[in-house]
Amino acid sequence: MNKICLKYLLLPWIKNIPKKYISNLKMDSRTLTPGDLFIAVPGIKKDGRHFIVQAINKKAAAILCETKKKDKHGIFKYIKNVILIYFFKLSENVSLLANRFYKEPGKRLKIIGITGTNGKTTVTQLINQWSTILGTKTATMGTLGNGFYNSLQPTNNTTSSPIFIQLFLSKVLEKQAELVTMEVSSHGLIQHRVKEVPFYIAIFTNLTQDHLDYHENLEKYESAKWLLFSTHKVKKIILNADDQYGKIWLKKLLNFYTVAVTIQNRKQKKYSTKWINATNIEQNNNSIYITFESSWGTGRISSCLIGRFNVTNLLLSLACLLELGYSLSDLIHTSEKIIPVQGRMELFSYVKKPTFIIDYAHTPDALKKTLNAIHSHYQRYIWCIFGCGGERDQKKRPIMGAIAEKMSDKVIITNDNPRNEKEKKIIQDILNGCKNKEKILIIPDRKKAISYAYFGAKYHHIILIAGKGHEEKQIIQNRSINYSDKKIVLNLLGKNI
């Protein structure tokens, strides 16, 4: 990459900086190379300002250091020939700096931002998949990875760092991407990671209890999600208007371009610019058929995705693609080509073997909707295997225990990612929500729990494995070990095929 002048980069904020050229922007001192600009800001776990000495020793070209004092903004000094510049509210401006450094890549792309408690990954991947089928070069950023369809690179965060986001947009633009779908987490919004991303469309899936370990309460969590629609650059907004928050937000956004997405609920369309409403849903074992009416016309799409929540996910994706200018006829005719998203209601069904369903459901609402979907499609004996993550929202644990007990025939409580929390404490928290202990088994080892269910189930039974979905690691204490629900399931089924 060509070097950029630090004086030019900082011009919108600081005027008197000496001419100096930098190669890259870095927030992690471990990845620094000579000539980089080190951006030292406080984080949740570590403070980048504590690593300034390492940055100097690694021959950073310059250092930007966050200061809480407004009068220190723009002051600079030299330490071992490295310029250190104080920057007021630097954390809030990293996205803007990165956007300027990478020459505003978002302006030459159509970027779709998807937020919500559940469904972000599915909608992100559906739009990616559907648009790719129709010939568009679409890149994606999110939980399943970053990149183009079928070539995603693993990622640690749902929403990446503000620097990486702009770098990614720059790289996919070089590879002739036209469209980018991006999961936008509440953490990413509060931490200003997408502040300078020009979203063409923002989509809201739903809002239910999650991340209360971080946000403290549902009101603060709602406020975080609302930031995407209230303070960010968005041209069009698509809302799940069946969701209680979606309904409220639709009325708050009367002066904006909105699309209301509903199931058998025409009342919300009077508050929106455009709308789409499912009028009839037909379900069988492995398929769903959705008849709809909309501002673009009427039609019927078919899909192998199951569950009422996936009707909403499909309609949100359909509305987005219609707003992007795709033809309704083309979308209807290609809907049946869409395949399930990895780790989201992912089905493994073989003759005379129990049917496995792997799903990422890790919130009370998601678990309830997943079990509802299984009931409506299969009407069979259901095993539910799940746990809850350690060092995360503890309030949801008994609620999820109650849901699993009520909606399943047999429940196995196991480990999810216990992290540094005691597994017995997590399991007991879940058990506190359960009344009928006779239908519940405790098998902390997740692999053993899945094996027990497989060998104990009859061929017509359904075994739901909830919570980890696509994940290929399990975090126990400070160790991240190789682990995959899917690999265990395929191994079990393969032994007897």
UniProtKB/Swiss-Prot annotation:
The cysteines covalently paired via disulfide bonds are none
Q: Where is this motif: Meso-diaminopimelate recognition motif?
A: 416-419
The residues the record assigns to binding UDP-N-acetyl-alpha-D-muramoyl-L-alanyl-D-glutamate are 29, 157-159, 185, 191, 193
- Which residues hold meso-2,6-diaminopimelate? 392, 416-419, 467, 471
Q: Tell me one GO biological process term.
A: cell division
What's its top-level EC category?
Answer: ligase
Q: What is its EC number?
A: 6.3.2.13
What keywords does the record list, in alphabetical order?
Answer: ATP-binding, Cell cycle, Cell division, Cell shape, Cell wall biogenesis/degradation, Cytoplasm, Ligase, Magnesium, Nucleotide-binding, Peptidoglycan synthesis
The UniProt entry lists the main location of this chain as cytoplasm
Keyword Nucleotide-binding listed:
yes
Q: Does the keyword Cytoplasm apply?
A: yes
A single Pfam family, by name? Mur_ligase_C
One example of the protein's molecular function in GO is: ATP binding
- State the reactions this protein catalyses: UDP-N-acetyl-alpha-D-muramoyl-L-alanyl-D-glutamate + meso-2,6-diaminopimelate + ATP = UDP-N-acetyl-alpha-D-muramoyl-L-alanyl-gamma-D-glutamyl-meso-2,6-diaminopimelate + ADP + phosphate + H(+)
The listed locations are: Cytoplasm
Q: Which GO terms describe its cellular component?
A: cytoplasm
What is its cofactor?
Answer: Mg(2+)
Q: What PTM annotation applies here?
A: Carboxylation is probably crucial for Mg(2+) binding and, consequently, for the gamma-phosphate positioning of ATP.
What is the role of this chain? Catalyzes the addition of meso-diaminopimelic acid to the nucleotide precursor UDP-N-acetylmuramoyl-L-alanyl-D-glutamate (UMAG) in the biosynthesis of bacterial cell-wall peptidoglycan.
Please state which protein family the record places this protein in.
Belongs to the MurCDEF family. MurE subfamily.
Please give the name of this protein. UDP-N-acetylmuramoyl-L-alanyl-D-glutamate--2,6-diaminopimelate ligase
Source organism per UniProt: Buchnera aphidicola subsp. Acyrthosiphon pisum (strain APS)
Q: Which gene encodes it?
A: murE
